[in-house]
């Protein structure tokens, strides 16, 4: 359910692409510093977006760091990285999200790889939970609730997607300060979008396997594609509306690129395959 909140690289300037890569590498570097090499597997585009958003919103309020370093992925030529306090926050959340998700897969499917990975992240997640108990409790509770919905075969899209939305709202609410309403709304609506887009993307496969998918019933409607597009547009409009209320200056064009264009890339790619038309994005 990760990897949907991505930049539209084709529409980014070289400078913006460099800014994105440095934030991505900065998050990876802080995950490694806090949780070791095993934690690097939890690196995601979605938490990179949150890292960039929070670093922009709280620019100047916390010390920022940057540099050029080698790493296991780039052992020869050093790469530019940058980080600040919100980066450490996102590093902890990255590990916690993948830990609880792996535990969920083990409990649901007895996936041995998931069990092994969650075991590797046991200590790291315990440390993250001590620093961010509210957020980690929300991850655990919301994933458990999602399991209940899935076991019941729920087709209540608002309730099921809202569960993941509630999880993301807690993660976006970094400080519970004056910007909490806007951040929570961005997280909530983006979380619903991610959940439903993931279900939309997996629908054909889930039907073949007889697996749960909340869109199974809606997909029988003759205007299913139009309904889904309306839902996605509404959710992202709410995200954008609340984002524009934030006083972000640093990387604002990069953030807009992700929210207004990047998040649509996988949807557009899916529809290009379905219709046989070239992806215009």
Model-identified regions with their sequence ranges:
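Short, electropositive alpha-helical surface patch
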Residues: 254-260
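Acidic catalytic motifs of isoprenoid enzymes
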Residues: 1-185, 192, 196-233, 241-251, ...
């Amino acid at each position: 359910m990760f990897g949907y909140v991505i930049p539209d690289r084709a529409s980014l300037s070289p400078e913006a692409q460099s800014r994105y890569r440095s934030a991505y590498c900065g998050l990876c570097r802080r995950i490694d510093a806090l949780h070791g090499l095993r934690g690097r597997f939890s690196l995601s585009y979605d938490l990179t977006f949150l890292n960039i958003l929070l670093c922009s919103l709280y620019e100047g309020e916390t010390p920022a760091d940057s540099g050029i370093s080698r790493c296991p992925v780039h052992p020869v030529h050093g790469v530019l990285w940058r980080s600040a306090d919100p980066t450490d926050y996102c590093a902890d959340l990255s590990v916690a999200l993948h830990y609880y998700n792996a535990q969920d897969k083990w409990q649901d499917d007895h996936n041995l790889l998931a069990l092994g990975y969650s075991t590797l992240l046991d200590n790291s997640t315990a440390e993250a939970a001590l620093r961010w108990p509210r957020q980690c409790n929300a991850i655990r509770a919301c994933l458990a609730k999602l399991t209940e919905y899935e076991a019941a075969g729920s087709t209540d899209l608002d309730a099921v997607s809202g569960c993941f939305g509630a999880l993301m709202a807690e993660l976006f609410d970094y400080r519970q300060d004056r910007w909490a309403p806007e951040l929570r709304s961005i997280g909530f609506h983006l979380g619903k979008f991610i959940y439903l887009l993931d279900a939309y993307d997996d629908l054909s496969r889930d039907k073949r396997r007889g697996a749960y998918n909340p869109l199974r019933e809606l997909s029988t409607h003759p205007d299913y594609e139009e309904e889904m597009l309306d839902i996605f547009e509404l959710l992202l409009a709410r995200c954008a509306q609340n984002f524009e209320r934030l006083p972000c200056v640093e990387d604002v064009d990069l953030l807009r690129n992700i929210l207004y264009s990047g998040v649509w890339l996988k949807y557009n790619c899916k529809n290009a395959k379905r219709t046989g038309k070239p992806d215009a994005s």
